[in-house]
């Protein structure tokens, strides 16, 4: 299955690039750089000639093409489209290969279709936060499933001997995945509501922030009736509440994931220990990036890296859980009529 593995490796790299481009596009306020989908002002590329701009004026009255933002959006779409085609190809190869995994590739292809729809709705629904958040989560899920598929294509390298692994750890891994996923949702909700700069002090927020908490409006996921959601529609109390929740979630996530890392490292299996180190390093990097976002007022490079760090964290935690559940086949010996397992 060498071809399968190579293609999945390429897909993993391409997915990380798409995640970076998506974050860069969103944080550069270029999410509506092209107001239609899948093209840009009715073109496959960004219109720039006099004739093309004349057509834009006729079909999109009152709108002005911003080339820098439009190109950011289209480059993101080109990479995302290429990733989708690659995943479809991987799925077909797996379906026609007798011993190749089937379920994960099919789910990946379905997820690509869902991501395309969410990408379209992100534009047509003018950056509605719940759609933006779902699109972000879908991209991370693609990353996770591709990593799991890679493990399935190299099964002997991602197995452990259960007698050397605490059985409670396998179930705890599910809890940690849920915690990290929830924190990613909170991060996506913070970003899509433009709430990342609502608190400028550590560890929680400045002033009497408790008296400003507005839970009702902060988590109204179906906040309808707005012509556009670009730059946010919520008032300060709601945005501040979202930001505070994300910070508290970060503290809970740090405690849970660090506990998980120490527990993983105590196991005797080398691959489990390696994953523990990798998860711990990414977690510490995420904390540093999150603090830097606050101290330096959300620099673009740091914010984009924070997005990729979140994707790496959920991927590594998910892979560690997968590995913990892959039991290494027992070794059978027959010596003079006796059978040992």
Model-based region annotation:
Residues 238-295:
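Helical hairpin unit composed of two closely spaced alpha helices linked by a short loop
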């Amino acid at each position: 299955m060498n071809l399968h593995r190579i293609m999945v490796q390429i897909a993993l790299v391409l997915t990380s690039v798409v995640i970076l481009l998506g974050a860069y596009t969103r944080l550069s306020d270029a999410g509506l750089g092209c107001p239609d989908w899948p093209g840009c002002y009715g073109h496959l590329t960004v219109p720039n000639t006099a004739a093309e701009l004349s057509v834009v004026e006729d079909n999109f009255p009152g709108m002005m093409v911003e080339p820098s933002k439009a190109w950011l959006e289209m480059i993101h779409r080109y990479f995302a489209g290429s990733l989708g085609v690659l995943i479809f190809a991987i799925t077909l190869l797996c379906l026609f290969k007798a011993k190749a995994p089937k379920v994960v590739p099919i789910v990946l292809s379905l997820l690509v279709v869902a991501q395309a729809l969410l990408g379209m709705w992100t534009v047509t629904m003018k950056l509605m936060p719940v759609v933006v958040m779902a699109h972000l989560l879908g991209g991370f899920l693609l990353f996770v499933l591709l990593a799991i598929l890679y493990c399935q294509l190299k099964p002997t390298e991602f197995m452990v001997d259960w007698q050397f692994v605490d059985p409670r750890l396998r179930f705890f891994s599910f809890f940690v995945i849920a915690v990290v996923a929830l924190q990613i949702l909170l991060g996506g909700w913070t970003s899509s509501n433009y709430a990342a700069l609502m608190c400028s002090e550590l560890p929680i927020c400045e002033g009497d922030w408790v008296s400003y908490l507005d839970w009702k409006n902060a988590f109204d996921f179906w906040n309808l009736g707005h012509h556009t959601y670009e730059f946010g529609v919520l008032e300060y109390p709601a945005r501040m509440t979202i930001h505070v929740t994300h910070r508290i979630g970060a503290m809970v996530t740090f405690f849970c994931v660090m506990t998980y890392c120490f527990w993983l490292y105590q196991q005797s299996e080398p691959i489990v220990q390696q994953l523990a180190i990798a998860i711990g390093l990414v977690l510490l990097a995420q904390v540093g990036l999150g603090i830097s976002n606050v101290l330096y007022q959300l620099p673009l490079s740091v914010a984009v890296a924070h997005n990729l760090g979140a994707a790496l964290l959920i991927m590594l935690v998910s892979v560690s859980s997968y590995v913990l559940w892959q039991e290494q086949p027992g070794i059978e010996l027959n010596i003079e009529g006796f059978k040992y397992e």
